[in-house]
């Protein structure tokens, strides 16, 4: 082969990410060189040309190597970025975990480069792979040419190939060094971020613990700020203060729950562990703050309920209180209202009673019998009545008090002893009343022990230092009705009270009720055949140091007054008493109302008994009761309720007046009546109904 027939190989720079191929390759132009030409003895004729070709190819190879080394760091890190992108890692690591993921990419690439380097270095050992080969290659090549006297082509291609491998190994080593440094930098950065995260987490935890220890203080401070932002109340009542405080706390809870919802969203979308921990701590603090506010709200609600119950009980007490002055005069008073006005003045009423007593005494002296002498008429003012009220005197609950001695109370009777024994004192005269049309006539009636009982119960009044009043409590005869309270306002405190006290109790004067009027009438005796229905009456004794004489009180509750049933009730179907535990209760069935309407009853107890007897005898309604309840109902008792609807000792169905009797509701108006369980009855009254 002629020298001019030689074709030099080509240089190839291969960019393979961690592959096993050489980064710089020399590709020979031919794979066979044939039979080398004859070389005569003497110096080799190929040395000069061979060295020229070597230097030419070596220059190209060195330049390629130099170019790669110059941009090697950028290209290597670019490989890292491409691998990160393929792995779905963020372009810029912001957390220690992100950095460690990036470090894993770098370490994997470094391992791949090391394997490629090892593939080069593990080839059969020969002269060309010596560590100093690039420096010695030219001299070695020249020596080979001089010694072999062969054609230079084969030697040249082998030298260029091995130089390419040596340079590739150098590139791999440089890349490994770059990657190793990068890996260490990433490790240091990750550790730094972890340390910073630990420090930040410790700060967050310390802040959380401090805030948790001051939850109550923070909650109160926020409530104070919210309260200060509202218009200030001037001399607020406890009820106003409670209402304001309840509004503030309720709004604060609503605000905290909104924050709670937003914070829960932060937990789900937290960008890193620290932010998630912050949100988690905030969630715990919000739970504590809401619990603190709820505890406040519970206390406020409990106090509000307590005050409402006190007010309700006070209202019930007031509605059932007969208030009178203890001045020895004759007075009439309406329950929960005040003194009933007298048409011609209080003195005229006292005179009318005196006249009636005198007339009755004269009549009895000449012809002993049961006689009654009217002394006043009671009329109800229709202008003060609402449409739903029974506009008759029967709806007025009133009491009349007078000196008991005028009705024949012996002065020698020890009332205190009689009262302690729950005893009675016989009186020759008592008071009674009778509804006649739209008026009620009050009369003095003689007693005979048969038609009109002589015995009058005795009670002792006790001084209430809190109210400054003398009081007597008269228990109700029905479980659902409250007791009656009789009070007297003394002209001055009793003897054992210090009138010069710096804080004396000054009772309020008894108000005047304008809804009814007592008009004195001329004393006219009438004979009473049969048995007279008497209202409740008592003889009230007072402590010796009170200076108050014994008082006879005749008081009337519409429940104790005879009356005719009115109203139509309502049609019912299915489980009638199923509604007794709900809403306003179960209405009076229309078929029962039809049976009772128009009938006159001695008192409320009589009506109730006849009502339940009628229900027990109804062929349809009676099917809803068990034999035990039916047996009780046939005797006039109410049916039993299930245990969950009972209240203390109240275990039977009760009848409730939708419009209170004290407010003019009809006692026997069946449109005003509903059947309720004891539990529901209490709930209705607590609601102010």
Swiss-Prot record:
Transmembrane segments: none annotated. Its EC number is 3.1.-.-. It holds the Pfam family Pyocin_S. The keyword Hydrolase applies. Signal peptide: none annotated. InterPro entries: Colicin/pyocin_DNase_dom_sf, His-Me_finger_sf, HNH_nuc, Pyocin_killer, Pyosin/cloacin_T_dom, Pyosin/cloacin_T_dom_sf. Zn(2+) binds at residues 656, 681, 685. GO terms for molecular function: endonuclease activity; metal ion binding; signaling receptor binding. Causes breakdown of chromosomal DNA as well as complete inhibition of lipid synthesis in sensitive cells. Belongs to the colicin/pyosin nuclease family. This is Pyocin-S2. It comes from Pseudomonas aeruginosa (strain ATCC 15692 / DSM 22644 / CIP 104116 / JCM 14847 / LMG 12228 / 1C / PRS 101 / PAO1). The gene is pys2.
């Amino acid at each position: 082969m002629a020298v001019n027939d030689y074709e030099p190989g080509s240089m190839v720079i291969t960019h393979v990410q961690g592959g096993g191929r050489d980064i710089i390759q020399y590709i020979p132009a031919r794979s066979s060189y044939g039979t080398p030409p004859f070389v005569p003895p003497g110096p080799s004729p190929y040395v000069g040309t061979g060295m020229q070709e070597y230097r030419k190819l070596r220059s190209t190879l060195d330049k390629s190597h130099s170019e790669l080394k110059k941009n090697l760091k950028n290209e290597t890190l670019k490989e890292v970025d491409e691998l990160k992108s393929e792995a779905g890692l963020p372009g810029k690591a912001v957390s220690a975990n992100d950095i460690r993921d990036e470090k894993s990419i770098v370490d994997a690439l470094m391992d791949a480069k090391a394997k490629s380097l090892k593939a080069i270095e593990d080839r059969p050992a020969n002269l060309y792979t010596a560590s100093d080969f690039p420096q010695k290659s030219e001299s070695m090549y020249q020596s080979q040419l001089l010694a072999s006297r062969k054609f230079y082509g084969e030697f040249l291609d082998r030298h260029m190939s091995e130089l390419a491998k040596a340079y590739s190994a150098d590139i791999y080593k440089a890349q490994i060094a770059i990657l190793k440094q990068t890996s260490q930098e990433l490790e240091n950065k990750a550790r730094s971020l972890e340390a910073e995260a630990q420090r930040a987490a410790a700060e967050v935890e310390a802040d959380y613990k401090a805030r948790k220890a001051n939850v109550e203080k923070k909650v109160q401070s926020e409530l104070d700020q919210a309260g200060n932002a509202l218009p200030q109340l001037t001399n607020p009542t406890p009820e106003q203060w409670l209402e304001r405080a309840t509004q503030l706390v309720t709004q604060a809870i609503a605000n905290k729950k909104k924050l709670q919802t937003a914070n829960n969203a932060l937990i789900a979308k937290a960008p890193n562990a620290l932010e998630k921990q912050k949100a988690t701590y905030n969630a715990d603090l919000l739970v504590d703050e809401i619990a603190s506010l709820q505890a406040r709200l519970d206390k406020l609600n409990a106090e509000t309920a307590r005050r409402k119950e006190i007010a309700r009980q006070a209202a019930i007490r007031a509605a059932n209180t007969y208030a009178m002055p203890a001045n020895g005069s004759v007075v009439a008073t309406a329950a929960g209202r005040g003194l009933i006005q007298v048409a011609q003045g209080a003195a005229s009423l006292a005179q009318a009673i005196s006249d009636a007593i005198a007339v009755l005494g004269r009549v009895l002296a000449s012809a002993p019998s049961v006689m009654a002498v009217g002394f006043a008429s009671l009329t109800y003012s229709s202008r003060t009545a609402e449409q739903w009220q029974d506009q008759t005197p029967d709806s007025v609950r009133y009491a009349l008090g007078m000196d008991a001695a005028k009705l024949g109370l012996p002065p020698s009777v020890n009332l205190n002893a009689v009262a302690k024994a729950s005893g009675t004192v016989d009186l020759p005269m008592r008071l009674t009343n009778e509804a006649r049309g739209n008026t009620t006539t009050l009369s003095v009636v003689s007693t005979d022990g048969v038609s009109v009982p002589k015995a009058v119960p005795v009670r002792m009044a006790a001084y209430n230092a809190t109210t400054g009043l003398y009081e007597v409590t008269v228990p109700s005869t029905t479980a659902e009705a409250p007791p009656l309270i009789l009070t007297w306002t003394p002209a001055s405190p009793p003897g054992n009270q210090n009138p010069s006290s710096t804080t004396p109790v000054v009772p309020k004067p008894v108000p005047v009720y304008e809804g009814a009027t007592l008009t004195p009438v001329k004393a006219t005796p009438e004979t009473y055949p049969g048995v007279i229905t008497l209202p409740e009456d008592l003889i009230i004794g007072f402590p010796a140091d009170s200076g108050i004489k014994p008082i006879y009180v005749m008081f009337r509750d519409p429940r104790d007054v005879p009356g005719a049933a009115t109203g139509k009730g309502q049609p019912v179907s299915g489980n009638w008493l199923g509604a007794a535990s709900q809403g306003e209760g179960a209405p009076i069935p229309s078929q029962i109302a039809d049976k009772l309407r128009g009938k006159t009853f001695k008192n409320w107890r009589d009506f109730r008994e006849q009502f339940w007897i009628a229900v027990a005898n109804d062929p349809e309604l009676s099917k809803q009761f068990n034999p035990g309840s039916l047996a009780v109902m046939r005797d006039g008792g109410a049916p039993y309720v299930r245990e969950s609807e009972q209240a203390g000792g109240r275990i039977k169905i009760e009848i409730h007046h939708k419009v209170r009797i004290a407010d003019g509701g009809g006692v026997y108006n069946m449109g005003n009546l509903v059947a309720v369980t004891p539990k529901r009855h209490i709930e209705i009254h607590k609601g102010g109904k």
